[in-house]
Structure formats: C-alpha cells, structure tokens
Amino acid sequence: MKFALLHILALAACACAFGKPYYVSSSGGSDSNDGSEAAPFKTIAAAPSENAEIFLKRGDVFYGAISGFKNCKIGAYGEGAKPVICGLKIVKNPAAWERLANDVWRIDLTKPENFDGYFAEGKRNNIGAVYDMAKDKVYGHLVTRYNALNAYGDFWVSGEVSRVNVQDKSENFRYLYFRSKENPSSGGAKIAFSTSGVGISNLENCEVDSVAVKGFGVHGVARAWGCKFRNMDVDLIGGSVQLGYPHWVRLGNGFEFWVSDKRPCSNNLVEGCTVSRTYDCGATIQGIGDGDMLIENVKFVGNTFIRCRQAFEHFVRSRKGTAKYSDCEFSSNRSFEAGENEFSTPEARDAALLSYEGKPVSGLLVKDNFFWGSSVYSNQTHTAKMESNTFYVFGDQYLVFNRYKPEAAIFADSENAVEKMRAFLGNDTDKIFIADRGDFSLLDRIISERFKGSEADIRRICKIPEKSLLESLRFW
C-alpha cells in the first residue's frame, strides 16, 4: 500500500513538472487523433511544445529535426529499439543516379520522387556524409572540388561543377557527386545522405530520455538550457561545410553547449548516452565572445564515445572580457578509438581530448574517464584539471601535441615519454599505458571488461570480429 501511494505521488509530481502526456507514433498514428496512447499523433509537431510529456513509440523513426521545446519531457513508450530522430535522406530510386566520366555518379537532390526519409531542401542539402544503411558503412570523405574526386567513395556537393571550396552562403547544393565503379545504389546497397541540421536544439528546462538521434550534418544536440539528456544514442553526426566561415571547414559535434557572453548554455547534464561516428567531438563546451563569459554546471557523466574525432573538446575565450567555467565536468566516461571517426579525414588534432584554451582553466574537471586507442591531448596552451583518468595509447600516437609548437610534442614511444606526460599534466593519478595494436587478447579483454553494455555497438561500428576469430588471427 505504501509503495502504491509513493508511486502515485511520483506520477503526480512528474505530471506537475511537465504537464499532460502525449503519445506519438510515426508508424501507426494520425495528427487528427487526440494524442493518447490508444490514439497517438503521427508527428512530433502535433504535440504541444511547452509543459508536456511527449512519448515517442519505440521502433519508430521520426524524420526531421526537433526544436523549440520548453518545460517538456521527451521519452519513449512501447517495446523495441529507441525511437530515432533522423536526418537521413534516403535514395529510393537507383535510376536517379546519372553516370558521368571517370566513374563519377551524380544525383539531383531537388527531386522528391527519388527519395524517402527526410526530404531536405536548399541548404539542408549541404550533405555531411554518404551512408550505406544496408552495410552500416560511412563514406565521409568530402572533397573541395569536382576534379578532386580521386578515390572511390569520395563525394562532393554543389549546384555548379566549376565551384571550388564550397562555403559561400549562396550555394544551392543541387547535385551530389559520388565516385564509384558501379551505381552506388546497386548490389544491395541502401544509400542515404546525412543532411545539414541539428537533431535536437533550442530546449529549455527539458528532459530527453531513451531517444536516438542519427544522420544530421551539423550537430546531434545543441543549444540547450537547464536540460537533462539521458540514455540517448547519437550516431553519424557532422561533416557539413560551415557556410560563411573565412575558409573551407567542416563541423559536427555530438553534444555541443555553446558559451556566449549573453546566454551561455548552462545547467545541462548528459548522462548514460552513447555517441558514435561524429565528424568532430562527441561532447563539447565551447564559445567565443566579446564580453564576460561564464558557463556553469555542465556535466558529461557516464557516457560512451565510439570513434568520435575527440571524446571531449573545450574552449571558452573572450576577446575583451573574462571567460570562466564553474562546476563543469567530464567524468566517468569511456571512449573507444577517438580519432578514427570514419570520415576519412585524419588530422593532427585527432585525440581523446582537445583544448583551444589560451588562458589557465579552472572550474572544469576531467576525472575518472577511460580512453582506449587514441592520442591523449591535442592542446593549445592550457588543459583542464585532470584526475584519475586511464589512457591506453598506441605506440604510433602522441601523448600531447600543440600544433603551434609541434617540436614540443610528446610521443607514446617509451616509458620516459609517459613520465614526461605526467609532469606536463601535473598530477600522478592519471594512468597511461602504451599498447600494441596487434594485441588482440588485450583488445578483447578491454571491450568485455571496460565497455560492458556497448560490446555489440563497438564490434559493429569498428568491424571487430568476435573473440574466437581474434585469437585465430593472432595465432596465424
């Protein structure tokens, strides 16, 4: 009786906090329904954007980004896989591909009859990656001009074949060009494109739980204030060109909390999420402004990062004022092979951690994390406070690297280098081990012991065979 009463009180408190519940099913709903579990809406847009609980049906896919919710809880109901907020534009008509010279194929992105999924238009066709859904394979190497389509799997997007370094805001992104021996949609392939956009953005005082985000070319989650993000899967993020930037550059983070001098994205928690295959970092606190800047209470706790360019990136810089963190942390997370992000664009900054801090950092703690198979820190001048982290680094990777002072790099080539790194970090609680890329037994043990619950995701994404095959490869 006591338990039942407590349960009723808990439900009442939840209803008071977020308001009336609404249910949404893309596979079995209708926007003319009342939004009850028995008669769900079809689209998220049909539900209120303020003071509501919004439950998305498990196993369903919701195409297009969501934005602008306030005082809401967004969760899942039913059985099966997490509901997916998806930005993928899916080729349904293989004949839409036109073969050009030198094994280059072209598809017109403006023809809705040739696509399923999210039909992006205009600058949303600033494609971040080409993705074979059937093989779970990413083709992420975007070239800067048509005549740079040199390797199979390269792609380029523009309305004019003569364009170079597509970054101008006037670009219309009409055609996607892809180099392939055969029609890209042949042989059982199911080709899709990650479209330019942010999966979830502009949330205030919201909770998002047990929802997946996939296939957006800008960020997975960004621009949030006072929010909690739990048990989410964020995959295949980034790669779009940053339009209007002074030079050609791509972008794309899993979770980004931007710091401005007017409205910093403070008071956010990301917990128990899995972030994979991001063009840039899995998680970041970053920002540049003119006035005084303060970011408070942003925490990444207990998350898993798989093949992101970096697991965590941080920088807060003010041109004319102060820039500070307060009570921010990246703790108890685990990262697998940061830097191997599958976008085929290796850079010197590929590492577990990335800092662009120009001044000493306080109020930001990196603690109790586990990193496998990546360089440690790409650092400009100052690191965050480090405590009790564990790094397994391959012998051909670095421990710290500053692109402005490459001569000061410390490479993972000896135990003496490890001691130098300890001195650089200024603490003796971090553990650093130099690992052999060919040590498959260690790899298997790390996956099974340190990445419990994520073993299948790691083996699928990284194409790692099961233990028995690993052992046979080592034997031969």
Say what each PLM segment does.
Residues L6-C14:
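Bacterial N-terminal signal peptides
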Residues A15-G19:
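Boundary at the C-terminal end of the N-terminal hydrophobic targeting segment
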Residues Y63-I66, T195-S201, F216-R223, V234, ...:
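Short glycine/acidic-rich loop motifs that flank beta-strands on beta-rich extracellular proteins
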Residues R58-G59, Y77, L88-I90, F216, ...:
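Low-complexity, Gly/Pro
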Residues Y23-R223, G238-G252, E256-W258, A412-D430, ...:
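Extracellular polysaccharide-degrading/modifying enzymes targeting complex plant/algal/animal polysaccharides
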Residues Y63-K73, G80, K92, V316, ...:
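Predominantly extracellular beta-rich ligand-binding scaffolds that present long acidic/polar faces
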